[in-house]
UniProtKB/Swiss-Prot annotation:
The gene is RTL8C. Belongs to the FAM127 family. It comes from Homo sapiens (Human). It comes from the Eukaryota. The lineage of its organism: Eukaryota, Metazoa, Chordata, Craniata, Vertebrata. RTL8C is one of at least 11 genes called Mar or Mart related to long terminal repeat retrotransposons. They do not correspond to functional retrotransposons, but rather to neofunctionalized retrotransposons genes. This is Retrotransposon Gag-like protein 8C. InterPro entries: DUF4939.
């Protein structure tokens, strides 16, 4: 019994740390993009909004492009594989990567985003 009392006293003597809450992004997690041109604007808005509110996580162009790549599937994922294999500079250029996506997946030039 003495051991228990000592243990309880020792535990009670420990400083109480406030629970650290993990920050949760208020923007819904972006859906995947498979190369459907009609869904490209929606994909860009979803991923851009998600990254915008979490600037600490997405602090560089490389991290932003990497995140976009994780949301690609099907033909869109197949499209990006050669860029990864040759370590394309576009992987470190968020705006350049978006411009290339728009070009490849048929974004009309007069549409500004």
């Amino acid at each position: 019994m003495d051991g228990r009392v000592q243990l309880i006293k020792a535990l009670l003597a420990l400083p109480i740390r406030p629970a650290t809450r993990r920050w949760r992004n208020p923007i819904p997690f972006p859906e995947t993009f498979d190369g459907d041109t009609d869904r490209l604007p929606e994909f860009i808005v979803q991923t851009g909004s998600y990254m915008f509110v979490d600037e600490n996580t997405f602090s560089s162009d490389a991290l932003k492009v990497t995140f976009l790549i994780t949301r690609l599937t099907g033909p869109a994922l197949q499209w990006v594989i050669p860029y990864i294999k040759k370590e394309s500079p576009l992987l470190n250029d968020y705006r350049g990567f978006l411009a290339e996506m728009k070009r490849v997946f048929g974004w009309e030039e007069d549409e500004d985003f």
